Amino acid sequence: MTISLKTAPLLEVSNLSVDFRTDGGWINAVDDVNFTLAPRETLGLVGESGSGKSVTALSLLRLHDQRNSRLGGSVRYKGEDLFTLATSRLQQIRGHEIAMVFQDPIHTLNPVLTIGRQIEEGLRLHHGLQGREARKRAIELLDRVRIPDVARRIDEYPHRMSGGQRQRVMIAIAIAGDPKILIADEPTTALDVTVQAQIMELLRNLRDELSMSVILISHDLGLVSEFADRAMVMYAGQPVETGPINKIFDEPLHPYTEGLLSAIPDLDDDLDRLPTIPGSIPEPSRRPPGCRFAPRCTFAQASCVKPQPIMSLTGGRASRCPPRLPTEECVL
């Protein structure tokens, strides 16, 4: 999908930071996150486990425990800053204007309520539907996400369904409020390849039919490349590269992005060992003072010990690694 650069953003995230309280004090988990999301656009958040993707997504709707977390920056939806909104107004937006599909439906769905009751709850809250009217709409939603034998299965409990069916139920709950933005956090985790493809095809169809914007969180670069318009690559709590999905895959600017792409095995190659990025993401309390990827980077230089701000480039691109910009024109 081609998004006009002149389209006003639906969501605008500026200088987002997230800290968590620990026994040793406050620890920063995510910082310096900036991005926009246009109407009907799909943005992929990409990175290894521990890169800050899910922490970023949960913070957009203030879903972290307020007693043990603190948020910085701003998240503006249609001009309203979600970080300063009254709880009553935020509740109107959650699940209605902005909805979320979580990565682990078996732990997200209520085990003591039927799937029908759980869908009807959102319909009552956001649309005022009751009784038969709510049940009829719940059946329509389950049918829309392709749950078979809906009239019977609407009264089943989550544990009676397969992983793929539970994820479809989560999607039905998410779209019940007719959201403008859908956040999908690793929606295909723990599903086999065939079911993964079915879930992604379902999300693609719903996105187009309902004219939604989507934030897709995934460690699977191949999946993101087939679904997203743009990508934001995260490492150790920071974005390290953003840009149109085709540009990121064809001409990665940051060594971490290049490493992720190189780690995708080619089925035509006869490999004794899968390609990997050496090392691991540092713990939040042990991040290096300069470039956070430098200890794992084969291109590291002396200047990498200094903080690396992300630089905006032509073509809607940005990177946190100046040495990897031989052909780009910096606009800062």
UniProtKB/Swiss-Prot annotation:
It is found in: Cell inner membrane. Residues 11-261 form the ABC transporter domain. It comes from the Bacteria. Its main location: membrane. Its EC number is 7.4.2.-. Keywords: ATP-binding, Cell inner membrane, Cell membrane, Membrane, Nucleotide-binding, Peptide transport, Protein transport, Translocase, Transport. One of its GO terms (molecular function) is ATP hydrolysis activity. It is a peripheral membrane protein. ATP binds at G47, E48, S49, G50, S51, G52, K53, S54. Belongs to the ABC transporter superfamily. The complex is composed of two ATP-binding proteins (BMEII0205 and BMEII0206), two transmembrane proteins (BMEII0207/BMEII0208 and BMEII0209) and a solute-binding protein (BMEII0210). This is Putative peptide import ATP-binding protein BMEII0206. It comes from Brucella melitensis biotype 1 (strain ATCC 23456 / CCUG 17765 / NCTC 10094 / 16M).
